[in-house]
């Protein structure tokens, strides 16, 4: 096997950078990766033929006029590029109980929920039983690649903070839940055979506990009890791992008491969780003393390696919106490497990072051509991608340096579906392109799994600003930022107010607090669930800036070369000098005084 030490444009096989021996159990998996990435176009042609063949009798493809054709030419000529809004009527019929072959000839087994629609509701992505096999296949490739870079992971355990989220039933009786909740509750996960590379400190019962506090507490106490066995720490998102550290900051005294006595706090009431933890939590006064010593200092720099001294890396997603958490993770971990291992969504699992220990700024994912059929819409200089199907480029024919919007066709019945991810081609491994995640199309604010676009933010501001009218006040201009200086992160909205008229009064703090809550009520269900059920987003904050601040903002932009004729107030700011300018003009700050409304209600028709 030849050495692959960097992103390659030649035919190379995967091998450890140190040229060490590949473990016998990994050889087959690494060979599979090389076969898939060498024969990209042939695999893609086969996958498309399989998808079109098995779904030939569906209502959707029949309406497209394919007449059973399974070749690329017919597919390109007759199947349109679509968004969720185009498919929503078909999906709603399935959700309402129509079991005819609408999108897939295989029965829809459940819906996987994705981030919100323009109406603020979660998208429902149909899935089928054998999709679990494809997901499991991709998971099975991760550790063979990681073993090339980090030896000895089979000699210890992983402390992964994993959680299930609430699920609902559609009117037709199908379950609707997030993709990872579906996976954790599947037999693939619950009945997985022992594997030294997937040996976790968290009992399955703790992961499956729906109560966020009990689940986190149980996983944390088990991770502390096995501190010397932990070789890697992880969560799905960087924000999730930081939430776990914040949990330790708030609860270390109780955790230490439990470890000293060997008795779990009565705050954990779930019987299955208590039983699972009892097998791990034994009296350990010395460990309790160490935890108290480390956590009582008030110095949390490097806390991860101080508490879990054998940790080799963090396994978290730090690309896209999660990149904002990198400095905080570096602070708490003492500079441990961060591994981004795979690229997936509710619609489809796409691929993996063949250089998982690279710098977070250099993460590129190799899309595995067997997971679905992939096409790409070129993104122009303005960052927009047209919906013109004639512009679509095949997976094997993308160009290095270009940006594209990902379009997928899946076994579950999504045909030429625009995912909304914008990717940049960074190179090739064998014949397979490697992509850097650039951004989610149209997303303005994101703390974790929430995604708020400009139109939604505008509606929320309009709804909240109605509370100002009795005071003769209005919002003259606004912008926003996702603030992650504290854990959990929260939305910050900058308002410049205008008061006018003889009856104008000073807008009091109580009213501005209610404006914060009113904005939260107007945001999508994903945001509100994160606030209410998960606690992964903090209260929304409105910072009122002094009059003239947004004029100063424009002056600053023009001084840096912006055209006065084309200048528009940015609805989200991330550039530090601009954030500093805004913060220096703040005259008052207000937080949402309560939680917004959210319930995991049954989906109505």
UniProtKB/Swiss-Prot annotation:
Keywords in alphabetical order: Ligase, Plant defense
Top-level EC class as recorded in UniProt: ligase
Domain of life: Eukaryota
Family annotation (InterPro entries): GH3, GH3_C, GH3_M
GO BP field: auxin biosynthetic process; defense response; intracellular auxin homeostasis; pollen development; regulation of defense response to bacterium
Binding site for AMP: 115, 342-346, 365, 421, 440
Enzyme Commission identifier(s): 6.3.2.-
Tissue: Expressed in the inner floral organs (lodicules, stamens and carpels) and at lower levels in lemmas and paleas.
GO molecular function: acid-amino acid ligase activity; AMP binding; indole-3-acetic acid amido synthetase activity
Knockout mutant characteristics: Slight increase in disease susceptibility to Xanthomonas oryzae pv oryzae.
GO cellular component: cytoplasm
Upregulation: Induced by auxin.
Family listed: Belongs to the IAA-amido conjugating enzyme family.
Anything else known: Plants overexpressing GH3-8 exhibit enhanced disease resistance to Xanthomonas oryzae pv oryzae. Plants overexpressing GH3-8 exhibit abnormal morphology and dwarf phenotype. Plants silencing GH3-8 produce mostly non-viable pollen grains.
Record's function text: Catalyzes the synthesis of indole-3-acetic acid (IAA)-amino acid conjugates, providing a mechanism for the plant to cope with the presence of excessive free auxin. Produces more IAA-Asp levels than IAA-Ala levels in vitro. May participate in the activation of disease resistance by preventing the accumulation of free IAA, which reduces the expression of a group of auxin-responsive genes encoding expansins that control cell wall loosening and expansion. Contributes to late events in stamen and carpel differentiation, and influences floret fertility.
Protein name: Indole-3-acetic acid-amido synthetase GH3.8
Species per Swiss-Prot/TrEMBL record: Oryza sativa subsp. japonica (Rice)
Gene this chain is encoded by: GH3.8
């Amino acid at each position: 096997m030849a050495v692959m030490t960097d992103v390659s444009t030649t035919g190379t096989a995967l091998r450890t950078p140190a040229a060490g021996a590949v473990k016998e159990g990994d050889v087959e998996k690494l060979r599979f990766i090389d076969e898939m990435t060498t024969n990209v176009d042939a695999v893609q042609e086969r996958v498309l033929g399989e998808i079109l063949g098995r779904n030939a009798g569906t209502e959707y493809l029949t309406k497209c006029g394919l007449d059973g054709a399974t070749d690329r030419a017919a597919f390109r000529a007759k199947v349109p590029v679509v968004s969720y809004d185009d498919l929503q009527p078909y999906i709603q019929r399935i959700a309402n109980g129509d079991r005819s072959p609408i999108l897939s000839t295989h029965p829809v087994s459940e819906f996987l929920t994705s981030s919100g629609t323009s109406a603020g509701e979660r998208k429902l992505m149909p899935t089928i039983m054998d999709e679990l096999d494809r997901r499991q296949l991709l998971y099975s490739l991760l550790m063979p690649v990681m073993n090339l870079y980090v030896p000895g992971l089979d000699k210890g355990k992983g402390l992964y903070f994993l959680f299930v989220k609430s699920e609902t039933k559609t009117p037709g009786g199908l379950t609707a839940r997030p993709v990872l909740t579906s996976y954790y509750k599947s037999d693939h996960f619950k009945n997985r055979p022992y594997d030294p590379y997937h040996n976790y400190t968290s009992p399955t019962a703790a992961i499956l506990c729906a109560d966020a506090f009990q689940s986190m507490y149980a996983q944390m106490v088990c991770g502390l009890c096995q501190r010397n066995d932990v070789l890697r720490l992880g969560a799905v998102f960087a924000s999730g791992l930081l939430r776990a550290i914040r949990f330790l900051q708030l609860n270390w005294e109780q955790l230490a008491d439990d470890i000293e006595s060997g008795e779990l706090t009565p705050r954990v009431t779930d019987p299955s969780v208590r039983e699972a933890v009892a097998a791990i939590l034994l009296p350990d006064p010395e460990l309790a003393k160490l935890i108290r010593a480390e956590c009582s200092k008030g110095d949390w720099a490097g806390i991860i390696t101080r508490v879990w001294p054998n940790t080799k890396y963090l396994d978290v997603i730090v690309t896209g919106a999660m990149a904002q958490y990198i400095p905080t993770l570096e602070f708490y971990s003492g500079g441990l490497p961060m591994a981004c291992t795979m690229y997936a969504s509710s619609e489809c699992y796409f691929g993996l990072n063949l250089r998982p220990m690279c710098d977070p700024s250099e993460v590129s994912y190799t899309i595995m051509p067997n997971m679905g059929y992939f096409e790409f819409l070129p993104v122009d200089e303005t960052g927009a991608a047209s919906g013109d199907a004639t512009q679509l480029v095949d997976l094997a024919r993308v160009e290095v340096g270009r940006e594209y919007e990902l379009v997928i066709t899946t076994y579950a019945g999504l045909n030429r579906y625009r995912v909304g991810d914008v990717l940049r081609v960074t190179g090739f491994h064998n014949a397979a392109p490697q992509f850097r995640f650039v951004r989610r199309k149209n997303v303005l604010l994101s703390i974790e799994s929430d995604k708020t676009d400009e139109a939604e933010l505008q509606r929320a501001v309009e709804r909240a600003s109605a509370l100002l009218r009795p005071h003769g006040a209005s919002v003259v201009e606004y912008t926003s930022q996702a603030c992650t200086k504290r854990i959990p992160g929260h939305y910050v909205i900058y308002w410049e107010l205008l008061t006018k008229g003889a009856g104008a009064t000073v807008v009091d703090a109580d009213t501005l607090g209610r404006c914060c809550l009113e904005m939260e009520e107007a945001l999508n269900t994903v945001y509100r669930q994160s606030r209410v059920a998960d606690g992964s987003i903090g209260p929304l904050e409105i910072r009122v800036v002094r009059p003239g601040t947004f004029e100063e903002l424009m002056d600053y932009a023009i001084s840096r070369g912006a055209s006065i004729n084309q200048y528009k107030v940015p609805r989200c700011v991330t550039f530090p000098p601009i954030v500093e300018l805004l913060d220096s003009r703040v005259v008052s700050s207000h937080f949402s005084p309560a939680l917004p409304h959210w319930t995991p209600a049954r989906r109505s028709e």
